[in-house]
């Protein structure tokens, strides 16, 4: 896959994501225990209007909402995210297709070392804050 096609697929994914609704479980607004944890659960009731995909009911996830396969799961910049805990893990990355995300358990001193080494290797760090 060439660079132009890759960028085109990233744009297609961004356009699809803008239109994608939030998929929430059936009647999530009705019970407080669902409001605090609004994640998808498939409707399974025999009389469920949402399962029958009736007009006016919330949308259900289906394969048509997914991103193009070649760019699925990538960072919006087009890089594959890799979680980094130390400098040794950073050196295994491919700077052309992978970007580093420093783990939240890493302290300030080691974070500075990782950022310096990433700059030397030409690796993009997705969360460079100090």
Curated annotation (Swiss-Prot):
The keyword Ribonucleoprotein applies. Belongs to the eukaryotic ribosomal protein eL32 family. One of its GO terms (biological process) is translation. The keyword Protein transport does not apply. GO terms for cellular component: cytosolic large ribosomal subunit. Keywords: Ribonucleoprotein, Ribosomal protein. This is Large ribosomal subunit protein eL32. NCBIfam families: PRK08562.1. InterPro entries: Ribosomal_eL32, Ribosomal_eL32_arc, Ribosomal_eL32_CS, Ribosomal_eL32_sf. Pfam families: Ribosomal_L32e. One of its GO terms (molecular function) is structural constituent of ribosome. The gene is rpl32e.
